[in-house]
């Protein structure tokens, strides 16, 4: 029993330290994003397949958009990491989530608007330092590509993370 507690605490500490190091490398410019043209709808579909395909997952995700394809400049790997982090509950969270990723395009502002509704990660925005740092990492990524990142823990439909990407 004590061994399990030590193992769990050690893993949490390691995640925390790794998150701090990652944020530090981002802020110092030591990590460079790949700036490439990507089909955002395809990337979202791949993340949905990954999250919905997890064994014993407590998260089910659906995509709501009228867009068949939409290209934008981003880093494919970091975009994947961004969405997966939003859809991953914290270690001790056993609640079930029916998350929705909504995407719409605003032609006048040349931007894609994303709402990740009922996102498990939005619920823990200020819960612990590790999640706070992960939100900072996510925001850094979105800001790098000219977007906005916002967490709403008390949104009407459920905890929501909203962000934009220029297109």
Pin down the residues of each PLM region:
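Glycine-rich/acidic phosphate-handling loop/turn and adjacent ATP-lid/helix
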Residues: 112-135
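Short beta-strand/loop element within the Bergerat-fold HATPase_c
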Residues: 98-110, 117
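A conserved beta-strand-to-alpha-helix junction within the catalytic ATP-binding
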Residues: 34-49, 80
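Conserved glycine-/histidine-rich ATP-lid loop and adjacent helix of the Bergerat-fold HATPase_c
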Residues: 137-146
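Conserved catalytic submotifs in the C-terminal HATPase_c
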Residues: 34-39, 58-70, 106
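Short alpha-helical segment of the dimerization/phosphotransfer core of two-component systems
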Residues: 8-13
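Glycine-rich ATP-binding loops of the HATPase_c
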Residues: 101-102, 146-152
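Helix-loop junction within the histidine kinase core
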Residues: 20, 24-35
């Amino acid at each position: 029993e004590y061994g399990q507690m030590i193992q769990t605490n050690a893993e949490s500490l390691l995640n925390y330290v790794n998150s701090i190091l990652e944020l530090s490398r981002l802020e110092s410019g030591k990590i460079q994003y790949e700036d490439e043209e990507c089909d955002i709808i395809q990337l979202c579909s791949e993340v949905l397949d990954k999250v919905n395909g997890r064994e014993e997952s407590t998260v089910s995700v659906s995509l709501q958009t009228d867009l068949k394809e939409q290209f934008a400049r981003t880093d494919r790997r970091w975009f994947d990491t961004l969405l997966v982090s939003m859809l991953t509950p914290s270690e001790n969270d056993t609640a079930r989530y029916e998350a929705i990723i909504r995407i719409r395009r605003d032609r006048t502002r040349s931007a894609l608007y994303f709402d990740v509704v009922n996102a498990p990660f939005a619920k823990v925005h200020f819960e612990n330092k590790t999640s706070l740092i992960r939100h900072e990492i996510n925001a850094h990524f979105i800001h790098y590509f000219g977007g906005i990142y916002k967490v709403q823990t008390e949104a009407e439909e459920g905890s929501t993370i909203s962000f934009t990407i220029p297109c």
